[in-house]
Amino acid sequence: METIFAQSSAFGKAGVAVFRISGPKSLEVLQLLTGRKDFKSRLMYYQQITFPESGELIDNAMVVYFKSPGSFTGEDVAEIYTHGSKAISIMLINALLNIPNIRLAEAGEFTKRAFLNNKFDLTAAEGIADLINAETIMQHRQAIRQAGGALEELYNNWREQLLQIISLLEAYIDFPDEDIPDSILNKVNNTHTNLINEISNYLNDNRRGELLNSGLKLAIIGPPNAGKSSLLNFLMQRDIAIVSNIAGTTRDIIEGHLDIGGYPIILQDTAGIREESSDIIEQEGIKRAINSAKTADIKIIMFDAEKLDSSINEGIIDLIDENTIIIINKIDLIEPSKIFLIEDKYKCLRVSIKNNIALNDILKNIENIAENMAGFTETPYITNQRHRHYLKQGLTYLKNFTLDNDLVLATEDIRMTVRCIGTITGVINVNEILGEIFKNFCIGK
């Protein structure tokens, strides 16, 4: 196995920069860079880091050696903690590149080696990647649970039950003349039925985990001049959309990302929807607005209080669903006692973006819907499409299984289900998917 290295921290100005070395030459590399021969495992040392050939000082740093298998990768590992300087990073990388039989690590290669050395399964490796990419508290909580082995435990539990079914069926196949109690077949049937129900229910999760990973798309729609762009600017806390009294100012979709209650939200401000427009560009904007609303996880439909009755049309009303927030804006311009027809059928928020009236109610409603769609449950949920694909495939094999068929063929259906689950966790040979998974890591991890 080759010895690899990389800067594990971000390249640039920082208090500390971290370099990781993994492989059989790790200790030798550390000795060459420091001139020190005796390193005890897991003990931190303060050392000068120099070019091995010239002796030129690179930095005064903290270094540590981890003897295999007690390291992140399971191999001999050395770590160097320098000052966070671009110049220091460049010099140390050059020094490492000049040492024979050591190379720069590929993206995710340290984590890949840890997986290959049985430090964790593939789901935990993916959890580490999600943890690095997490931008909100809820994304962090999901990732830390997965990195800690929660999905591995769930999938392995199903796999063990399936292996038990196989062992019972093989007893029937190998010893057909033996008097095996019917209770054994009853146990097979019960376990099989329970697993179908569990996996089916698990898949029927409305993509909660994937939504949390990728972000919930929120489309702001409504007639022209209702205050959609003003709402976007309020939510983003900066002016990213042009606000104007001229109808049709927003022509294309304007997007922004934010954190509401720990949930990642992808905001989309859209063109005002109206039935009559002779402007070809505005017509295309309206078409995109409607498409955005149809694919959104959450919708905010905004109306101008002064023009509400005249601006409601069937195209907008048809977009309302359980994850829609209806806002009546510019409420400061009408009598408080005025009741709108739409309020008889739908719950509406009365706000004034301009005068900061009831704006926190908007945030709370968004958070409530996000929590309902992607909030935590006791059972860890599917976090990416790879898991969902193989679980669906495994469930198909599981549903094909019946004791009325030839037992050898029936057992093969269970084996294929085991293989699908093993592909998720990495229990079986999954070389063809390792590159796809680990390429999404950063260099140094």
From Swiss-Prot:
**InterPro entries in the record:** G_TrmE (IPR031168), GTP-bd (IPR006073), GTP-bd_TrmE_N (IPR018948), GTPase_MnmE (IPR004520), MnmE_dom2 (IPR027368), MnmE_helical (IPR025867), P-loop_NTPase (IPR027417), Small_GTP-bd (IPR005225)
Which GO-annotated molecular functions does the record name? GTP binding; GTPase activity; metal ion binding
- The UniProt record gives the binding positions of K(+) as 225, 244, 246, 249
Keywords noted in UniProt: Cytoplasm, GTP-binding, Hydrolase, Magnesium, Metal-binding, Nucleotide-binding, Potassium, tRNA processing
- What GO biological process terms are annotated to this protein in UniProt? tRNA methylation; tRNA wobble uridine modification
Q: Which pairs of positions does the record mark as disulfide bonds?
A: none
Q: Which residues of the sequence carry a binding annotation for Mg(2+)? A: 229, 250
Q: Which residues bind (6S)-5-formyl-5,6,7,8-tetrahydrofolate?
A: 20, 79, 119, 445
Q: Does the entry feature the keyword Manganese, yes or no? A: no
Describe the function of this protein.
Answer: Exhibits a very high intrinsic GTPase hydrolysis rate. Involved in the addition of a carboxymethylaminomethyl (cmnm) group at the wobble position (U34) of certain tRNAs, forming tRNA-cmnm(5)s(2)U34.
Instruction: Spell out the PANTHER family in the cross-references.
Output: TRNA MODIFICATION GTPASE GTPBP3, TRNA MODIFICATION GTPASE GTPBP3, MITOCHONDRIAL
Q: What is this protein called?
A: tRNA modification GTPase MnmE
Which species is the source of this protein?
Rickettsia canadensis (strain McKiel)
